[in-house]
């Protein structure tokens, strides 16, 4: 099966969506998750987005502790 066929496979798409919905950012950033699902973002790209948002959240928490 080549890459184009696997991208069109409904079971692969279902797994991609399920992984996105169960991600660590699904509660904090539901709009990002929905946009990624709608635009059929690959899991690799989604994981990069997720990592960046988690890092951003962690940096903001550290900053808020210093400011408070």
UniProtKB/Swiss-Prot annotation:
Protein name as annotated: Uncharacterized protein YbcW
Keywords on record: Signal
Further remarks about this protein from its record: Encoded by the cryptic lambdoid prophage DLP12.
Taxonomic superkingdom: Bacteria
Signal peptide (residue range): 1-28
């Amino acid at each position: 099966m080549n890459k184009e066929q696997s991208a069109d496979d409904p079971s692969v798409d279902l797994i991609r969506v399920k992984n996105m919905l169960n991600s660590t950012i699904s509660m904090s950033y539901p709009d990002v998750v929905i946009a990624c699902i709608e635009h059929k973002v690959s899991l690799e790209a989604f994981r990069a987005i997720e990592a960046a948002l988690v890092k951003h959240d962690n940096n903001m928490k550290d900053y808020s502790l210093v400011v408070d």
